[in-house]
Amino acid sequence: MAKSSMKAREAKRAKLVAKFAEKRLALKAIISSPTTSDEDRWDAVLKLQALPRDSSSARQRNRCSQTGRPHGFLRKFGLSRIKLREATMRGEVPGLRKASW
């Protein structure tokens, strides 16, 4: 079980990413555009650097929705491998069962 502070930190990051997503996208479009002048590009780079560090989606970490475990996370289910196995054995995941061949 992850510390509640780590779960809260990830929730805060998710909120910041959502808040600054449009602004980051607009600045990145200015930076990557070949028609932008060097001065405008440099201003956009400085503005992008001034945004909060946690507003970048690359700083988010996928975590298990039940335990907060960061490793062994399966994106399709939103659970860690351990909790997915437990739920599968209880028959709570439709269409998923233990392999046997």
From Swiss-Prot:
Record keyword RNA-binding present = yes
Pfam families per record: Ribosomal_S14
- MF terms per GO, please? rRNA binding; structural constituent of ribosome
Cellular component (GO) terms are: cytoplasm; small ribosomal subunit
**Segments crossing the lipid bilayer:** none
Which Gene Ontology BP terms does the record give? translation
The record's section on PANTHER family has: 30S RIBOSOMAL PROTEIN S14, SMALL RIBOSOMAL SUBUNIT PROTEIN US14M
Q: Which family does it belong to?
A: Belongs to the universal ribosomal protein uS14 family.
Q: What is its quaternary makeup?
A: Part of the 30S ribosomal subunit. Contacts proteins S3 and S10.
Q: What does this protein do?
A: Binds 16S rRNA, required for the assembly of 30S particles and may also be responsible for determining the conformation of the 16S rRNA at the A site.
- The protein's name is Small ribosomal subunit protein uS14
Gene that specifies this protein: rpsN
